[in-house]
Protein backbone atom coordinates (compact mmCIF):
# COMPACT_ATOMS: atom_id res chain seq x y z
CA UNK A 1 0.00 0.00 0.00
CA UNK A 2 1.20 3.49 -0.84
CA UNK A 3 1.23 5.42 2.39
CA UNK A 4 1.56 8.98 1.08
CA UNK A 5 2.43 11.26 3.98
CA UNK A 6 0.24 9.55 6.58
CA UNK A 7 1.51 9.09 10.09
CA UNK A 8 2.18 5.50 11.17
CA UNK A 9 0.27 5.73 13.08
CA UNK A 10 -36.59 -28.97 19.34
CA UNK A 11 -38.42 -31.60 17.44
CA UNK A 12 -35.51 -34.02 17.73
CA UNK A 13 -36.49 -37.22 16.00
CA UNK A 14 -33.21 -38.60 14.74
CA UNK A 15 -34.28 -39.34 11.26
CA UNK A 16 -35.69 -35.92 10.73
CA UNK A 17 -32.50 -34.25 11.70
CA UNK A 18 -30.49 -36.37 9.33
CA UNK A 19 -32.63 -35.17 6.47
CA UNK A 20 -31.54 -31.65 7.22
CA UNK A 21 -27.92 -32.56 6.89
CA UNK A 22 -28.38 -33.83 3.36
CA UNK A 23 -29.98 -30.61 2.23
CA UNK A 24 -27.08 -28.66 3.57
CA UNK A 25 -24.58 -30.79 1.76
CA UNK A 26 -26.03 -30.08 -1.61
CA UNK A 27 -25.88 -26.42 -1.04
CA UNK A 28 -22.28 -26.60 0.03
CA UNK A 29 -21.28 -28.57 -2.98
CA UNK A 30 -22.68 -25.94 -5.22
CA UNK A 31 -20.51 -23.44 -3.46
CA UNK A 32 -17.32 -25.35 -4.11
CA UNK A 33 -17.90 -25.29 -7.82
CA UNK A 34 -16.97 -22.04 -9.54
CA UNK A 35 -18.42 -19.48 -7.19
CA UNK A 36 -22.17 -19.13 -7.20
CA UNK A 37 -24.71 -17.36 -5.08
CA UNK A 38 -25.23 -18.88 -1.68
CA UNK A 39 -28.52 -20.59 -0.90
CA UNK A 40 -30.39 -22.33 1.89
CA UNK A 41 -32.83 -25.23 2.03
CA UNK A 42 -33.14 -29.01 2.04
CA UNK A 43 -31.40 -31.62 -0.11
CA UNK A 44 -33.74 -34.38 -1.25
CA UNK A 45 -32.68 -37.84 -2.38
CA UNK A 46 -33.95 -38.53 -5.90
CA UNK A 47 -34.32 -42.25 -5.24
CA UNK A 48 -35.99 -41.95 -1.83
CA UNK A 49 -37.78 -38.59 -1.87
CA UNK A 50 -36.42 -38.12 1.66
CA UNK A 51 -34.13 -35.41 3.01
CA UNK A 52 -30.62 -35.28 4.36
CA UNK A 53 -31.10 -35.09 8.13
CA UNK A 54 -28.90 -34.77 11.24
CA UNK A 55 -29.67 -37.76 13.44
CA UNK A 56 -31.66 -36.91 16.55
CA UNK A 57 -31.43 -33.20 15.88
CA UNK A 58 -28.03 -33.29 17.55
CA UNK A 59 -25.79 -30.26 17.28
CA UNK A 60 -22.76 -32.11 18.64
CA UNK A 61 -19.60 -32.63 16.64
CA UNK A 62 -19.69 -36.15 15.21
CA UNK A 63 -23.47 -36.38 14.83
CA UNK A 64 -24.24 -38.67 11.88
CA UNK A 65 -26.48 -38.11 8.87
CA UNK A 66 -29.41 -40.15 7.57
CA UNK A 67 -32.41 -40.05 5.25
CA UNK A 68 -35.69 -38.92 6.80
CA UNK A 69 -39.07 -37.58 5.73
CA UNK A 70 -38.70 -33.94 4.73
CA UNK A 71 -40.42 -31.86 7.41
CA UNK A 72 -38.63 -28.52 7.49
CA UNK A 73 -36.81 -28.89 10.81
CA UNK A 74 -33.65 -26.95 11.51
CA UNK A 75 -31.69 -30.18 11.27
CA UNK A 76 -32.72 -30.31 7.60
CA UNK A 77 -31.94 -26.68 6.80
CA UNK A 78 -28.59 -26.28 5.12
CA UNK A 79 -26.80 -23.25 3.81
CA UNK A 80 -24.45 -23.37 0.84
CA UNK A 81 -21.76 -20.78 1.45
CA UNK A 82 -19.59 -19.17 -1.16
CA UNK A 83 -16.56 -20.57 0.66
CA UNK A 84 -17.52 -24.10 -0.44
CA UNK A 85 -19.12 -25.31 2.78
CA UNK A 86 -22.50 -26.83 3.54
CA UNK A 87 -23.53 -25.60 6.99
CA UNK A 88 -26.34 -26.46 9.40
CA UNK A 89 -27.29 -24.69 12.65
CA UNK A 90 -25.15 -21.79 11.45
CA UNK A 91 -21.76 -23.09 12.54
CA UNK A 92 -21.58 -26.83 11.74
CA UNK A 93 -20.29 -28.19 8.44
CA UNK A 94 -20.96 -31.40 6.54
CA UNK A 95 -17.74 -33.28 7.25
CA UNK A 96 -15.88 -36.47 6.32
CA UNK A 97 -14.37 -37.92 9.53
CA UNK A 98 -10.59 -37.89 9.68
CA UNK A 99 -10.20 -36.84 6.03
CA UNK A 100 -11.19 -40.41 5.08
CA UNK A 101 -11.27 -41.29 1.38
CA UNK A 102 -12.57 -44.88 1.61
CA UNK A 103 -15.97 -45.92 0.21
CA UNK A 104 -18.43 -46.62 3.01
CA UNK A 105 -17.34 -43.73 5.22
CA UNK A 106 -20.36 -42.22 6.97
CA UNK A 107 -20.55 -38.45 6.89
CA UNK A 108 -21.14 -36.31 9.96
CA UNK A 109 -21.39 -32.73 11.10
CA UNK A 110 -18.45 -30.96 12.71
CA UNK A 111 -17.44 -27.45 13.62
CA UNK A 112 -16.34 -25.70 10.45
CA UNK A 113 -12.56 -25.79 10.16
CA UNK A 114 -11.73 -24.84 6.58
CA UNK A 115 -10.47 -28.34 5.74
CA UNK A 116 -10.94 -29.95 2.34
CA UNK A 117 -12.90 -32.76 4.03
CA UNK A 118 -15.62 -30.12 4.41
CA UNK A 119 -15.71 -29.18 0.72
CA UNK A 120 -18.30 -30.49 -1.70
CA UNK A 121 -19.37 -30.11 -5.31
CA UNK A 122 -22.94 -30.41 -6.62
CA UNK A 123 -22.80 -31.53 -10.24
CA UNK A 124 -25.33 -30.95 -12.99
CA UNK A 125 -26.09 -34.70 -13.09
CA UNK A 126 -27.39 -34.51 -9.49
CA UNK A 127 -24.37 -36.05 -7.78
CA UNK A 128 -22.75 -34.51 -4.71
CA UNK A 129 -19.02 -35.20 -4.64
CA UNK A 130 -16.51 -34.76 -1.85
CA UNK A 131 -13.70 -32.57 -3.17
CA UNK A 132 -11.01 -34.34 -1.12
CA UNK A 133 -12.17 -37.94 -1.68
CA UNK A 134 -13.73 -37.76 -5.14
CA UNK A 135 -16.52 -40.00 -3.82
CA UNK A 136 -20.26 -39.47 -4.11
CA UNK A 137 -22.70 -38.82 -1.31
CA UNK A 138 -25.22 -41.66 -1.29
CA UNK A 139 -27.96 -43.47 0.59
CA UNK A 140 -26.22 -46.63 1.80
CA UNK A 141 -27.24 -49.84 0.04
CA UNK A 142 -29.65 -47.92 -2.19
CA UNK A 143 -31.94 -47.76 0.84
CA UNK A 144 -35.01 -45.56 0.91
CA UNK A 145 -36.56 -45.98 4.42
CA UNK A 146 -36.29 -43.43 7.19
CA UNK A 147 -33.03 -43.95 9.04
CA UNK A 148 -30.99 -45.06 6.02
CA UNK A 149 -27.37 -44.10 6.58
CA UNK A 150 -25.75 -41.49 4.33
CA UNK A 151 -22.19 -42.27 3.29
CA UNK A 152 -19.49 -41.82 0.68
CA UNK A 153 -19.21 -44.32 -2.16
CA UNK A 154 -17.58 -44.66 -5.56
CA UNK A 155 -19.66 -42.67 -8.04
CA UNK A 156 -21.69 -45.11 -10.17
CA UNK A 157 -24.65 -43.12 -11.47
CA UNK A 158 -27.18 -44.88 -9.24
CA UNK A 159 -30.38 -43.18 -8.17
CA UNK A 160 -29.24 -43.34 -4.56
CA UNK A 161 -26.42 -40.97 -5.53
CA UNK A 162 -28.67 -38.34 -7.10
CA UNK A 163 -30.06 -35.39 -5.22
CA UNK A 164 -32.39 -32.55 -6.08
CA UNK A 165 -33.00 -29.10 -4.69
CA UNK A 166 -29.96 -27.20 -5.96
CA UNK A 167 -28.64 -26.22 -9.36
CA UNK A 168 -25.57 -28.21 -10.29
CA UNK A 169 -22.40 -27.31 -12.11
CA UNK A 170 -20.53 -29.34 -14.71
CA UNK A 171 -18.47 -32.13 -13.12
CA UNK A 172 -14.72 -31.70 -12.88
CA UNK A 173 -11.89 -33.84 -11.59
CA UNK A 174 -11.33 -31.40 -8.73
CA UNK A 175 -8.04 -29.99 -10.04
CA UNK A 176 -7.37 -27.13 -12.42
CA UNK A 177 -4.40 -25.33 -13.90
CA UNK A 178 -4.01 -21.58 -13.77
CA UNK A 179 -5.33 -19.97 -16.95
CA UNK A 180 -2.98 -18.12 -19.26
CA UNK A 181 -5.61 -15.42 -19.72
CA UNK A 182 -7.77 -14.41 -16.77
CA UNK A 183 -11.40 -13.29 -17.09
CA UNK A 184 -13.30 -12.21 -13.99
CA UNK A 185 -16.72 -11.10 -12.87
CA UNK A 186 -16.94 -8.55 -10.09
CA UNK A 187 -19.27 -7.63 -7.30
CA UNK A 188 -20.15 -4.03 -6.72
CA UNK A 189 -18.97 -2.19 -3.64
CA UNK A 190 -19.38 -4.65 -0.75
CA UNK A 191 -19.13 -2.29 2.24
CA UNK A 192 -18.92 1.37 3.17
CA UNK A 193 -16.59 2.55 5.94
CA UNK A 194 -18.18 3.46 9.22
CA UNK A 195 -18.24 7.04 10.44
CA UNK A 196 -14.79 8.56 10.89
CA UNK A 197 -13.11 6.53 8.18
CA UNK A 198 -12.80 7.53 4.54
CA UNK A 199 -11.37 4.24 3.28
CA UNK A 200 -11.35 0.48 3.83
CA UNK A 201 -8.30 -1.10 2.20
CA UNK A 202 -5.29 -3.46 2.22
CA UNK A 203 -7.36 -6.57 2.86
CA UNK A 204 -6.24 -9.97 4.13
CA UNK A 205 -8.81 -12.76 4.35
CA UNK A 206 -9.11 -16.35 5.57
CA UNK A 207 -11.94 -18.81 6.05
CA UNK A 208 -12.45 -19.42 9.79
CA UNK A 209 -15.18 -21.74 11.10
CA UNK A 210 -16.86 -21.61 7.70
CA UNK A 211 -17.02 -17.82 7.58
CA UNK A 212 -15.01 -15.05 5.96
CA UNK A 213 -12.65 -13.30 8.36
CA UNK A 214 -11.27 -10.07 6.90
CA UNK A 215 -8.73 -7.66 8.37
CA UNK A 216 -7.76 -4.42 6.68
CA UNK A 217 -6.40 -0.91 6.99
CA UNK A 218 -8.49 2.19 7.55
CA UNK A 219 -7.78 5.81 6.71
CA UNK A 220 -9.27 8.87 8.35
CA UNK A 221 -7.66 11.07 5.71
CA UNK A 222 -4.85 12.03 8.06
CA UNK A 223 -3.80 8.79 9.73
CA UNK A 224 -4.01 5.06 9.26
CA UNK A 225 -5.62 2.51 11.54
CA UNK A 226 -6.68 -1.11 11.34
CA UNK A 227 -9.91 -3.07 11.67
CA UNK A 228 -11.54 -6.47 11.35
CA UNK A 229 -15.00 -7.27 10.03
CA UNK A 230 -17.16 -9.44 12.27
CA UNK A 231 -17.13 -12.89 10.61
CA UNK A 232 -19.75 -13.31 7.89
CA UNK A 233 -20.94 -16.18 5.70
CA UNK A 234 -21.38 -14.68 2.23
CA UNK A 235 -19.80 -11.72 0.52
CA UNK A 236 -23.24 -10.14 0.27
CA UNK A 237 -23.24 -10.03 4.10
CA UNK A 238 -20.14 -7.85 4.26
CA UNK A 239 -22.13 -4.60 4.15
CA UNK A 240 -23.92 -5.42 7.41
CA UNK A 241 -20.96 -7.03 9.18
CA UNK A 242 -19.55 -5.15 12.14
CA UNK A 243 -16.45 -3.03 11.53
CA UNK A 244 -14.27 -3.35 14.62
CA UNK A 245 -11.30 -1.05 15.14
CA UNK A 246 -8.06 -2.37 16.58
CA UNK A 247 -6.67 -0.50 19.56
CA UNK A 248 -3.17 -0.95 18.15
CA UNK A 249 -2.74 -0.38 14.43
CA UNK A 250 -1.68 -3.26 12.18
CA UNK A 251 -1.47 -1.63 8.75
CA UNK A 252 -1.40 -3.66 5.52
CA UNK A 253 -1.88 -6.92 7.46
CA UNK A 254 -1.31 -10.57 6.60
CA UNK A 255 -3.40 -13.09 8.57
CA UNK A 256 -2.88 -16.85 8.69
CA UNK A 257 -2.95 -19.90 10.95
CA UNK A 258 0.52 -21.27 11.73
CA UNK A 259 -0.30 -24.97 12.10
CA UNK A 260 3.07 -26.19 13.47
CA UNK A 261 2.60 -24.06 16.60
CA UNK A 262 -1.23 -24.03 16.66
CA UNK A 263 -1.27 -20.23 16.68
CA UNK A 264 -2.69 -17.42 14.57
CA UNK A 265 -0.27 -14.82 13.22
CA UNK A 266 -0.95 -11.24 12.16
CA UNK A 267 1.95 -9.55 10.35
CA UNK A 268 1.96 -5.87 9.38
CA UNK A 269 4.05 -2.71 8.84
CA UNK A 270 4.87 0.62 10.50
CA UNK A 271 5.91 0.50 14.11
CA UNK A 272 9.08 -0.08 16.08
CA UNK A 273 10.42 -2.20 13.21
CA UNK A 274 9.76 -2.22 9.45
CA UNK A 275 7.65 -5.36 9.78
CA UNK A 276 6.02 -6.64 12.97
CA UNK A 277 4.01 -9.68 14.04
CA UNK A 278 1.59 -10.53 16.83
CA UNK A 279 -0.03 -13.87 17.74
CA UNK A 280 -3.40 -15.00 19.08
CA UNK A 281 -5.52 -18.07 19.76
CA UNK A 282 -8.67 -16.21 18.64
CA UNK A 283 -8.25 -14.29 15.36
CA UNK A 284 -11.78 -12.87 15.58
CA UNK A 285 -10.86 -10.69 18.57
CA UNK A 286 -9.21 -7.51 17.20
CA UNK A 287 -7.73 -6.63 20.57
CA UNK A 288 -6.71 -10.09 21.74
CA UNK A 289 -3.34 -10.15 19.99
CA UNK A 290 -0.02 -10.48 21.80
CA UNK A 291 2.53 -7.70 22.20
CA UNK A 292 4.31 -6.69 18.97
CA UNK A 293 7.48 -8.54 18.03
CA UNK A 294 10.01 -7.79 15.27
CA UNK A 295 9.45 -9.68 12.02
CA UNK A 296 12.08 -7.92 9.89
CA UNK A 297 14.62 -5.27 10.87
CA UNK A 298 16.40 -4.53 7.59
CA UNK A 299 16.40 -1.50 5.32
CA UNK A 300 16.42 -1.07 1.54
CA UNK A 301 17.89 1.59 -0.72
CA UNK A 302 16.25 3.63 -3.46
CA UNK A 303 12.85 3.65 -1.79
CA UNK A 304 10.74 6.49 -0.43
CA UNK A 305 8.72 4.13 1.74
CA UNK A 306 11.23 1.56 2.91
CA UNK A 307 10.09 -2.06 3.16
CA UNK A 308 6.37 -2.20 2.48
CA UNK A 309 3.52 -4.68 1.94
CA UNK A 310 4.93 -7.90 3.38
CA UNK A 311 3.47 -11.35 2.86
CA UNK A 312 4.42 -14.71 4.38
CA UNK A 313 4.28 -18.28 3.06
CA UNK A 314 5.87 -21.63 3.98
CA UNK A 315 6.85 -24.82 2.26
CA UNK A 316 7.80 -27.96 4.19
CA UNK A 317 11.17 -26.63 5.35
CA UNK A 318 11.20 -22.84 5.43
CA UNK A 319 9.11 -19.77 6.09
CA UNK A 320 9.50 -17.01 3.50
CA UNK A 321 8.94 -13.27 3.74
CA UNK A 322 8.28 -11.37 0.49
CA UNK A 323 7.92 -7.60 0.34
CA UNK A 324 8.06 -4.56 -1.92
CA UNK A 325 9.47 -1.03 -1.73
CA UNK A 326 7.45 1.10 -4.17
CA UNK A 327 10.64 1.14 -6.23
CA UNK A 328 10.47 -1.56 -8.93
CA UNK A 329 11.90 -4.33 -6.77
CA UNK A 330 10.59 -7.38 -4.93
CA UNK A 331 12.54 -8.77 -1.99
CA UNK A 332 12.69 -12.11 -0.14
CA UNK A 333 13.98 -13.34 3.21
CA UNK A 334 13.71 -16.82 4.76
CA UNK A 335 14.17 -18.80 7.95
CA UNK A 336 13.77 -22.47 8.98
CA UNK A 337 10.11 -23.12 9.67
CA UNK A 338 10.98 -24.38 13.16
CA UNK A 339 12.20 -20.88 14.09
CA UNK A 340 8.89 -19.21 13.25
CA UNK A 341 7.24 -17.11 14.59
CA UNK A 342 10.39 -15.04 14.88
CA UNK A 343 12.60 -12.36 13.42
CA UNK A 344 13.92 -12.73 9.87
CA UNK A 345 16.65 -10.25 10.79
CA UNK A 346 17.99 -7.67 8.38
CA UNK A 347 19.24 -9.78 5.46
CA UNK A 348 17.28 -10.22 2.24
CA UNK A 349 17.64 -11.05 -1.46
CA UNK A 350 16.40 -8.88 -4.30
CA UNK A 351 14.56 -11.37 -6.51
CA UNK A 352 12.90 -9.13 -9.14
CA UNK A 353 13.75 -5.75 -10.68
CA UNK A 354 11.79 -3.63 -13.17
CA UNK A 355 10.39 -0.13 -13.40
CA UNK A 356 8.65 1.39 -10.39
CA UNK A 357 5.32 1.25 -12.23
CA UNK A 358 5.69 -2.43 -13.14
CA UNK A 359 6.69 -3.68 -9.67
CA UNK A 360 5.09 -1.21 -7.31
CA UNK A 361 3.60 -2.83 -4.21
CA UNK A 362 0.93 -5.23 -2.89
CA UNK A 363 2.93 -8.43 -3.44
CA UNK A 364 1.18 -11.71 -2.52
CA UNK A 365 2.44 -15.30 -2.93
CA UNK A 366 0.36 -18.50 -2.96
CA UNK A 367 0.67 -22.26 -3.43
CA UNK A 368 -1.45 -23.50 -6.35
CA UNK A 369 -3.56 -26.43 -5.16
CA UNK A 370 -2.95 -29.66 -7.08
CA UNK A 371 0.05 -28.26 -8.93
CA UNK A 372 3.81 -28.10 -8.35
CA UNK A 373 3.56 -24.35 -8.69
CA UNK A 374 3.52 -21.08 -6.80
CA UNK A 375 1.74 -17.91 -7.88
CA UNK A 376 2.96 -14.39 -7.17
CA UNK A 377 0.88 -11.28 -7.87
CA UNK A 378 2.26 -7.74 -7.74
CA UNK A 379 0.36 -4.48 -7.97
CA UNK A 380 1.39 -2.22 -10.85
CA UNK A 381 0.51 1.31 -11.95
CA UNK A 382 -0.98 1.52 -15.44
CA UNK A 383 -2.44 4.07 -17.81
CA UNK A 384 -5.93 2.98 -16.73
CA UNK A 385 -5.32 2.59 -13.00
CA UNK A 386 -3.87 0.04 -10.64
CA UNK A 387 -3.70 -3.58 -11.82
CA UNK A 388 -2.01 -6.85 -10.88
CA UNK A 389 0.66 -8.75 -12.77
CA UNK A 390 1.21 -12.47 -12.10
CA UNK A 391 4.32 -14.66 -12.03
CA UNK A 392 4.85 -18.37 -11.38
CA UNK A 393 7.63 -20.49 -9.92
CA UNK A 394 8.21 -24.13 -9.04
CA UNK A 395 9.73 -23.30 -5.65
CA UNK A 396 9.64 -20.40 -3.22
CA UNK A 397 13.41 -20.09 -3.36
CA UNK A 398 13.53 -20.12 -7.17
CA UNK A 399 13.11 -17.64 -9.99
CA UNK A 400 9.77 -16.22 -11.14
CA UNK A 401 8.42 -16.31 -14.71
CA UNK A 402 5.94 -13.67 -15.94
CA UNK A 403 2.50 -15.19 -16.56
CA UNK A 404 -0.21 -12.56 -17.09
CA UNK A 405 2.01 -9.55 -16.73
CA UNK A 406 0.84 -6.69 -18.94
CA UNK A 407 -1.86 -4.07 -18.54
CA UNK A 408 -3.59 -5.47 -21.64
CA UNK A 409 -3.39 -9.04 -20.34
CA UNK A 410 -3.16 -8.70 -16.56
CA UNK A 411 -3.84 -11.05 -13.71
CA UNK A 412 -6.54 -8.57 -12.73
CA UNK A 413 -7.20 -5.03 -13.91
CA UNK A 414 -9.59 -2.85 -15.85
CA UNK A 415 -8.99 -4.93 -18.99
CA UNK A 416 -10.46 -8.12 -17.51
CA UNK A 417 -12.08 -7.46 -14.11
CA UNK A 418 -15.68 -7.04 -15.26
CA UNK A 419 -16.03 -4.30 -12.63
CA UNK A 420 -18.11 -1.26 -13.56
CA UNK A 421 -17.66 0.77 -10.37
CA UNK A 422 -13.85 0.98 -10.40
CA UNK A 423 -11.00 1.09 -12.88
CA UNK A 424 -8.48 0.23 -10.18
CA UNK A 425 -7.89 -3.29 -8.91
CA UNK A 426 -5.63 -2.67 -5.94
CA UNK A 427 -4.21 -4.20 -2.75
CA UNK A 428 -6.05 -7.36 -1.71
CA UNK A 429 -5.86 -11.11 -1.16
CA UNK A 430 -6.97 -14.28 -2.91
CA UNK A 431 -9.65 -16.14 -0.95
CA UNK A 432 -8.25 -19.20 0.83
CA UNK A 433 -10.39 -22.03 2.24
CA UNK A 434 -7.31 -23.36 4.02
CA UNK A 435 -6.11 -20.59 6.37
CA UNK A 436 -2.69 -22.08 7.13
CA UNK A 437 0.86 -20.97 6.35
CA UNK A 438 0.95 -22.76 2.97
CA UNK A 439 -1.26 -19.98 1.52
CA UNK A 440 -2.96 -22.53 -0.76
CA UNK A 441 -5.50 -21.34 -3.33
CA UNK A 442 -7.81 -23.44 -5.54
CA UNK A 443 -7.44 -22.49 -9.24
CA UNK A 444 -10.82 -24.12 -9.93
CA UNK A 445 -12.48 -21.53 -7.68
CA UNK A 446 -10.37 -18.39 -7.62
CA UNK A 447 -11.78 -15.34 -5.89
CA UNK A 448 -9.91 -12.11 -5.21
CA UNK A 449 -10.87 -9.65 -2.47
CA UNK A 450 -9.57 -6.28 -3.67
CA UNK A 451 -9.83 -2.55 -3.07
CA UNK A 452 -11.29 -0.24 -5.71
CA UNK A 453 -12.50 3.34 -5.93
CA UNK A 454 -14.82 5.41 -8.08
CA UNK A 455 -13.10 6.42 -11.35
CA UNK A 456 -13.74 10.10 -10.70
CA UNK A 457 -12.30 10.05 -7.17
CA UNK A 458 -9.27 12.28 -6.84
CA UNK A 459 -7.19 14.18 -4.35
CA UNK A 460 -4.46 13.13 -1.96
CA UNK A 461 -3.81 9.39 -1.85
CA UNK A 462 -4.51 9.26 1.87
CA UNK A 463 -8.06 10.55 1.31
CA UNK A 464 -9.02 8.31 -1.61
CA UNK A 465 -12.29 6.41 -0.97
CA UNK A 466 -11.11 2.82 -1.29
CA UNK A 467 -13.83 0.17 -0.90
CA UNK A 468 -13.89 -3.68 -0.97
CA UNK A 469 -15.03 -5.79 -3.91
CA UNK A 470 -14.59 -9.43 -4.95
CA UNK A 471 -13.59 -10.85 -8.32
CA UNK A 472 -14.62 -14.40 -9.29
CA UNK A 473 -12.73 -16.23 -12.04
CA UNK A 474 -14.86 -17.08 -15.07
CA UNK A 475 -14.30 -20.49 -16.68
From Swiss-Prot:
It holds the Pfam family Glyco_hydro_62. Its EC number is 3.2.1.55. Residues 39-166 form the Ricin B-type lectin domain. One of its GO terms (cellular component) is extracellular region. It catalyses: Hydrolysis of terminal non-reducing alpha-L-arabinofuranoside residues in alpha-L-arabinosides. Involved in the degradation of xylan and is a key enzyme in the complete degradation of the plant cell wall. It has a specific arabinofuranose-debranching activity on xylan from gramineae. Acts synergistically with the xylanases and binds specifically to xylan. From small arabinoxylo-oligosides (ranging from arabinoxylotriose to arabinoxylohexaose), it liberates arabinose and, after prolonged incubation, the purified enzyme exhibits some xylanolytic activity as well. This is Extracellular exo-alpha-L-arabinofuranosidase. It comes from Streptomyces lividans. The lineage of its organism: Bacteria, Bacillati, Actinomycetota, Actinomycetes, Kitasatosporales.
Amino acid sequence: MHRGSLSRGQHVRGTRRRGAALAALAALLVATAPAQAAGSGALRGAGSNRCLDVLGGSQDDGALLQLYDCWGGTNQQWTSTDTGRLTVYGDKCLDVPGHATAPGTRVQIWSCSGGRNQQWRVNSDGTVVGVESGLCLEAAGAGTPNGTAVQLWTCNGGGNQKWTGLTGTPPTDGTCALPSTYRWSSTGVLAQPKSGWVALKDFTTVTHNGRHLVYGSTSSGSSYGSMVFSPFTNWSDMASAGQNAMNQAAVAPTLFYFAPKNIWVLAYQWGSWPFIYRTSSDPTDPNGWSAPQPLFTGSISGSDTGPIDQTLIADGQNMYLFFAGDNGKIYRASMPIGNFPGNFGSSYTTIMSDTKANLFEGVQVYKVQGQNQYLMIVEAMGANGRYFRSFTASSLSGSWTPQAASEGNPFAGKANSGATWTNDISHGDLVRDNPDQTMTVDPCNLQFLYQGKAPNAGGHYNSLPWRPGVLTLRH
